[in-house]
Amino acid sequence: MNNIWWQTKGQGNVHLVLLHGWGLNAEVWRCIDEELSSHFTLHLVDLPGFGRSRGFGALSLADMAEAVLQQAPDKAIWLGWSLGGLVASQIALTHPERVQALVTVASSPCFSARDEWPGIKPDVLAGFQQQLSDDFQRTVERFLALQTMGTETARQDARALKKTVLALPMPEVDVLNGGLEILKTVDLRQPLQNVSMPFLRLYGYLDGLVPRKVVPMLDKLWPHSESYIFAKAAHAPFISHPAEFCHLLVALKQRV
């Protein structure tokens, strides 16, 4: 059986699982893992096929969620960034008894633009899939540059993301394509109306991948959830605003 790479740090009485985004790995959390592990029992995970979780092909969202759950604590706060937000949301939908609270970061229940729904144009995602076959390292780097564009610290934030990617072997092209397919096709807007656990959604005002226009739309669709926008962040608020980010999670811990 293929194994998910999993690291546990800290000894807090609440478990917190962090799920990274497309093309990346758990090293992306190194800017906040020391701070968070002083408040939580922290679980860092490489999603199947990414980072050190080798031997997986392209998976559906449901299969990715089930693979991650195999090694997870019985109950935890699940936090997912970008693509990881869809994985955490899927777990909240299928195994609500395992989810103490759900946190999504710069994530959308439907990344792809639809009628009257802001998102990434489908042809942009299809273009990324095509370019992966031609020059996948450059394509991943372009995607990372998009994630930090517009912030005051854009250049150093992009460098931090690139360093994370290059620290470990690149994922296989079919795994990267599978992740883009999830971003292109999945729509959890309606299902997530039914989750009852505490649900916190974090966004960057300058995010070029998850438009801030979705925030009030989801506030209305999911009145049981809470949203917070980092005024000067883009797609990676935990890199550009680590102290503020950790503060929000510690405050959530007091409420669950």
Curated annotation (Swiss-Prot):
Catalytic activity: 6-carboxyhexanoyl-[ACP] methyl ester + H2O = 6-carboxyhexanoyl-[ACP] + methanol + H(+)
GO molecular function list: carboxylesterase activity; carboxylic ester hydrolase activity; pimelyl-[acyl-carrier protein] methyl ester esterase activity
GO biological process: biotin biosynthetic process
The organism's place on the tree of life at top rank: Bacteria
EC number of the protein: 3.1.1.85
Record pathway: Cofactor biosynthesis; biotin biosynthesis
Notes on activation and inhibition: Strongly inhibited by phenylmethylsulfonyl fluoride (PMSF).
InterPro entries referenced in this protein's UniProt entry, alphabetically: AB_hydrolase_1, AB_hydrolase_fold, BioH, Carboxylesterase_BioH
Temperature dependence: Optimum temperature is between 20 and 30 degrees Celsius.
Main location per the UniProt record: cytoplasm
Keywords: Biotin biosynthesis, Cytoplasm, Hydrolase, Serine esterase
Compartment list: Cytoplasm
Pfam families the UniProt entry points to: Abhydrolase_1
pH dependence: Optimum pH is 8.0-8.5. The activity is more than 90% in the pH range from 7 to 9.
Summary of the function given for this chain in its UniProt record: The physiological role of BioH is to remove the methyl group introduced by BioC when the pimeloyl moiety is complete. It allows to synthesize pimeloyl-ACP via the fatty acid synthetic pathway through the hydrolysis of the ester bonds of pimeloyl-ACP esters. E.coli employs a methylation and demethylation strategy to allow elongation of a temporarily disguised malonate moiety to a pimelate moiety by the fatty acid synthetic enzymes. BioH shows a preference for short chain fatty acid esters (acyl chain length of up to 6 carbons) and short chain p-nitrophenyl esters.
Similarity-based family: Belongs to the AB hydrolase superfamily. Carboxylesterase BioH family.
Protein name per Swiss-Prot or TrEMBL: Pimeloyl-[acyl-carrier protein] methyl ester esterase
Lineage: Bacteria, Pseudomonadati, Pseudomonadota, Gammaproteobacteria, Enterobacterales
Gene: bioH
